[in-house]
Amino acid sequence: VSSETLPFEPSTTRSGPRRRSRAESMRDSLQFPLLVWLAHFLITQISATLAYRFGEFRTVEYEPTWTTFVPAWGPDSSAYGMVREPLTGWQHWLVEPFRNWDGTWYSLVAEGSYSEGLSATAAFFPLYPWLMQLLSDITGLPVETSGWIISHLAFLGGLIMAYKLIRMDFSEKIARWSLVALAVFPTAFFFSAVYTESLFLFLSVTTLWAARKNDWLLAVIMCFFATMTRSAGIMLGAPLAVLFIQQHGWDLKRWFPKALLALVPPMGLVIFGWFLTTKDLGFLGWQEQQWQWNRFSAHPGRTFQCVFQGCEETVRGFGGPYEATVHPVSFRWLEELIDNPRWSFITSTEFRYMVGQSQVLDVLVTILAFVLILIGLKKLPLFYSFWVIPPMIVPLLAPSSVFPLMSMPRFVLPLLPLFVMAVLLLQNRRRLAIGLATVSGILLFLLTNQFALWYWVA
């Protein structure tokens, strides 16, 4: 284990110093996450608002061969091409830049649009849009604004609970730097967007914090809600199983009746499946509708072959199966930049679009994540490894013909152990850590700008 790992809880007494220590610990567990949350809010919000005020929406896209550009308007990429109405007042500048891409899907669902005629909505799990709808009904705010508020509050809660969980196994320094690493990660703007990343982070971290404390009732309740938020919620069963066995051993007699609580989290999938059947979308509609994102079945080796070499795959379309060309990772944007390094080109919609479509970010993040996983097998608590391995493997079994590693830079965000492992590697390299955090923060600012103007990021 790491030298920063705490092998046991510090002993305390019943005297005044113990109470002060607890008070100080409580204050620190709130103050530092709040500071990190505020810094993240300022970076992402300033970038998004400036982009919306002074930038222009994407105006091009590739034609099918990916060799030339054709005119296209960014907002047309919204759910079913249904361009959302502009928000008014402060919401136009603060919220509207963060409702793009999947944000339009969640807004559509929040307005009650699970239906056979809009079958792709079945792919979006219900807890987040239901909360959007509930808050909108209470406050009278648009559903997008409700989602924006929920995401920010959930991210603050996620940071607080992440700090508490990390401190159970590591030092204060590791906990603090892990929060910083998470908040300034280049794609961390999704925590501010009308997406499920913040809510899922809060629920998954709270699930494992409760299990780590042997509070299994709270753990399974939080896991149930996580499963109602994203399909990856059911994968929390792996780290929960590790913690349960570590706490109760292999004697089956010691497992019961607590082991019966394991029936609670899967009920999230059962309830959602049943709900979809009432909308004529099928019990497994959330999985069956993945074809609308051009996903196909493959083993991880085939997925990476498509990433680096390109491939041909049969995918389902609205008119039936067809052969799709899967384009490999591209450095065309770099070649173009070397040939034309002028500022006018760097800020052009063509260059920014090429960067977004290149898949370079997908590849770098995926490789980095697996490197951290391998190192973490020796340096992290066992349940940390079981926390991150399943949600990293499953997307490799269902790549998209658009981008084989589509959304991986977003999928890693709630996987807290990856950030803890990165901090452990950098803990004795302060200058390098500060430099990387600075570069990451700059990339966060730039990618937030990209997202706000309808360029693809993850």
Describe these PLM feature segments.
Residues 43-62, 98, 237-368, 372-375, ...:
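Membrane-lumen/periplasm interface segments of specific transmembrane helices
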Residues 97-141:
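Short hydrophobic/aromatic helix or loop-helix immediately within or flanking a transmembrane segment
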Residues 133-137, 146-169, 368-375:
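Transmembrane-helix motifs of polytopic, lipid-linked glycan transferases
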Residues 142-146, 162-184, 202, 381-382, ...:
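Transmembrane-helix signature of polytopic, membrane-embedded enzymes
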Residues 161-164, 181-184, 199-218, 418:
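Specific aromatic-rich, kink-prone transmembrane helix
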Residues 170-172, 207-218, 248-250, 426:
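Membrane-interface transmembrane helices that cradle and orient dolichyl/undecaprenyl
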Residues 183, 187-190, 204-209, 217-244, ...:
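Membrane-interface alpha helices of multi-pass inner-membrane proteins
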Residues 193-199, 408:
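Short acidic/glycine- and proline-prone juxtamembrane loop motifs at membrane-interface regions
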